[in-house]
Amino acid sequence: MPPHEVWPGSIEAMYQEFMEYSYYVSKDTPTEFDQLLFLLLSEECRNLFEYKFKTPKGGHIDFPETRLDRVQKLWERVFPRNKMLRAEGRLLIQSENSEPFNPLRLSSGEKAVLYYIAGVLFAMPNAVILVEDPEFYLHHSIMKSLWDSIENLRKDCTFVYLTHDLDFAA
């Protein structure tokens, strides 16, 4: 398969740039969803290291809010029965009455929500974000409030929706 063009500022470009400096993880992350999860956790680790080295012994500085923090807040608002857990360098999901599990085991709709939230947070400043079929994989009852919440995460960006759903477009 011939190589494809990687757009500057895309998730794949950010992933490739990070991987140039990473010698301790696999270079093969097959999907953009996997790459987003990797970028979220990598930013979290970088912030933890930075916090550790900038905090004076016995002192305290405020820990900065990460993209993962913002994803988690919106995720748990959209899915109040699901919790996002960080354990031993991994991101896990726990539903009511279940053991924690890998986000790759989420339903298609849950993966879509996680992807949309995280993807928007990694968009370049003042980006125009084109969303084709914003209703894809989403239950109609959460669609409008979800996209309103996602837009509120990035007030600097312009969102353009391509949809056949007249209720959503109204």
Residue ranges and their predicted role:
Residues 165-170:
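Conserved H-loop
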Residues 132-134:
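Walker B catalytic acidic pair
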Residues 145-150:
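Conserved hydrophobic alpha-helix in the ABC-type ATPase nucleotide-binding domain
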Residues 1-4:
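N-terminal low-complexity, Ser/Thr- and acidic-residue-enriched intrinsically disordered segments
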Residues 162:
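Conserved D-loop beta-strand region of ABC ATPase nucleotide-binding domains
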Residues 9-111, 118-128, 152:
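Extended helical coiled-coil dimerization/tether regions that scaffold
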Residues 136-140, 144:
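Conserved D-loop-proximal element of ABC-family nucleotide-binding domains
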